[in-house]
Amino acid sequence: MEPQRRGRTLHARSYVHRQMYHTEDILYHNETYEKALRALEMGRAARENCDIVTGERAPQIVQLAGDDPEQFVQAARRFLPIADAIDLNLGCPQARARDGHYGGYLLKRREWPLLERIVQALCKSCDVPITTKIRLCDTASDTYELGQRLALAGSSVITLHARHVAPNRRRAGMAKLEHVRGLVDALGAERRTRVLSNGNVRSWADIPTNMAYTHADGVMVGEPLLVNPDLFAPSAACSHHQHYPAQCALSDSQCQWSGSPIVTYLSMCERYPIDAPMSCIQQHIQSMMRGLPPSRETRALHDALRDAGDVQTMLHLARSSSVLQLQAGAVHKDDPK
């Protein structure tokens, strides 16, 4: 999941597991660090983040942004007991990243020595993998060369969002996936650094197409996951509960309509009460509502959820909604046995 500095709750990240923080926020605003640590600890302990068949726990990656190598090291060290990897954000296109000199505004060639020093310092100081996320540089050759230099500096994974940095049109047009393939080729067949492709994935069917074209080792998805958090698990309407009911963390009533991501998300909000503002929860719900077919019933549900004042009321509305029951029923119908 593509991270954001603001607007992600633990419950949204429980489908995927990455969050971005500015190094200065972690070092100089203890409340921010303590909140981040609580969310990571809760995420690590959450039963939903553990595969009941293999016992494997989903990894949690902390993404940091900034422009000072020493601050990166200090901030990363604070997360080492709980993070499975540290990611360097070199892709944020927003105006605050430009004003703060971080994210995608460090991609100019003059900044490359600084980026190498940051990655090298993190690799030297941390005993977890160090990864990087970038966007396209001014030219294709610059993108490939920067990828090579980050790999040599120690980046275990490079995620390329195949669009240029633009604060006002940051997702305009299709991503230029040919440059992901170019980066893979530039790193070579014997590369140790893995490449993730970011862009042009809006459904499960897009994933194998993307990987076949780019030759990437995996994909990262951003905003489409806000609409459909189950994008990476098609037709998996609580398959764990269906096949392993004794081990499932959810009760029968909780799983009844678990094919709806809205019900799943609100159930997790209820089960893991952290200090996420209602405005943030509402924002996630409204994003998921965009995935429902338009109708009077959908509009009525949209308005009712928007006007609800607490998670319990929203969850009751969602569980009793015929619109979401139909959505879940369609998922269960398609679920392979």
Task: Describe each region flagged by the PLM.
Residues 54-68, 128-139, 196-199, 203:
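Conserved strand-turn element in the central/C-terminal portion of the radical SAM core barrel
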Residues 1-3, 90, 162, 223:
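Short secondary-structure boundary segments
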Residues 7-12, 98-101, 170-173, 208-210, ...:
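Short secondary-structure transition/capping segments
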Residues 9-13, 24, 29, 109-112, ...:
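Short, solvent-exposed helix-helix connector turns and helix-capping sites enriched
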Residues 1-78:
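Glycine-rich, positively charged N-terminal anion/phosphate-binding segment
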Residues 117-120, 125-127, 139-157, 181-197, ...:
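Alpha/beta catalytic cores of nucleotide-metabolism and tRNA/nucleoside-modifying enzymes
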Residues 3, 136, 227:
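Active-site micro-motifs of SAM-dependent methyltransferase domains
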Residues 70-195, 213-214:
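Alpha/beta enzyme core
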